[in-house]
Amino acid sequence: MKFLELNKKRHAIKTFNDQPVDYEDLRTAIEIATLAPSANNIQPWKFVVVQEKKAELAKGLPLANKVQVEQAQYVVALFSDTDLALRSRKIARIGVKSLPDDLIGYYMETLPPRFAAFNEVQTGEYLAINAGIVAMNLVLSLTDQKIASNIILGFDKSTTNGILDIDPRFRPELLITVGYSDEKPEPSYRLPVDEVIERR
């Protein structure tokens, strides 16, 4: 699918039918999503594919979001690794046979002290922007497979790790509902491009 067409076909779909989504198709979409760029190529994301615990995840959500989570075939909970120094060293460890020596040194020695100097706000902003980039890649990848999705920001992040049994070092960022739908969405209004461009 051409990129313009792909973007025009991507919509926030909020109702889903009963047609099953093949897990392998979702896994492929996530694999494609991880080709997204990330600052320092740190890839801080963690995808938790939720099916059995959807009902628990839906508790306490605003009604519209609750219905989506219950109807979706899967919910992808996107987390970010808050221990960036550890993440950096993990990339070096796993990639040791593929990465040149200078990059191994970069991940093992250069980046960890840089991340250690981040304050809480800097870490939060760093993680949020990387999460947004990979989430957009995921919904476009799903759209390319004709699978519907929606990004949910309105959920109780304080309970998500406990429900899904995820190490608290991983910060919940957003939920993505995944399924097939009978919705026939209309294109959302977009501001004219000249309203969002300035030249200097």
Swiss-Prot record:
Keyword entries, A-Z: Flavoprotein, FMN, NAD, NADP, Oxidoreductase
Cofactor list: FMN
Keyword Membrane found: no
Enzyme class: oxidoreductase
Gene3D superfamilies associated with the record: NADH Oxidase (3.40.109.10)
Any one GO MF annotation of this record: oxidoreductase activity
Highest taxon above the source species: Bacteria
Alphabetical list of InterPro entries matching this protein: Nitroreductase, Nitroreductase-like
UniProt EC number: 1.-.-.-
Keyword presence, DNA repair: no
Entry similarity comment: Belongs to the nitroreductase family.
This protein's name: Putative NAD(P)H nitroreductase Spy0809
Organism: Streptococcus pyogenes serotype M6 (strain ATCC BAA-946 / MGAS10394)
